[in-house]
Amino acid sequence: LTFKAHTVNQDQRTSLDLTPDRSLHLGNKFSLSFDIKLREELHTYGYVFRIISDDTSSCLDFISYQLRSRFNFILNKGSSIVENVDFIDSTQIVKDEWIKIRLDFTEQGIKISVNEATQMMRHSFKDFNSLSFLFGSNRHPKYYTTDVPPVSLRNIELYNQDGRIIRCWKLALHNRKGETMDEV
């Protein structure tokens, strides 16, 4: 899935809501992984995803800024930033190559992996009960954004506490309108 970003009108920017009908209840231990490829455009900043808890209480943001070879993972509670984890690496965060992203959520923290590099966010999602997964642009009442980075995504997978895949979006099939037609 290739995101339409800053080169198009805000209303035409890519939005992918993995939980359009209802939020997911995953417990305190689960994982999310996917592949991301960065494209070079004039503006390279934007929200890859927002994982929102209980509709408004907390949010985990993944922000890409390819111009600076930088990924930010920011945990917000209410209107405050709880923690910010940066990956800045011009050898790993490069355009036109697939980069593996994996987040492992536990009660102790969130292990974030970008290819082989790993960092730990010492705050957990233990107070996150129902989760919404929003990629790119979204119209959420509290976490609305149209800042979409020029990226492509594939192979989004959610794992349960036993490491078993419970959801998989390959993002390989599209119609002429750009809508994803994958199996879920």
Q: Where does each model-flagged region fall?
A:
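Localized edge beta-strand/strand-to-loop motifs within extracellular or lumenal beta-rich domains
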Residues: 96-111, 161
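Extracytoplasmic low-complexity segments
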Residues: 1-24, 162-184
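Flexible glycan-contacting loops in extracellular carbohydrate-active proteins
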Residues: 121-152
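Extracellular, beta-strand-rich glycan-interacting domains
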Residues: 36-40, 144-175
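Glycan-recognition/cleft segments
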Residues: 49-77
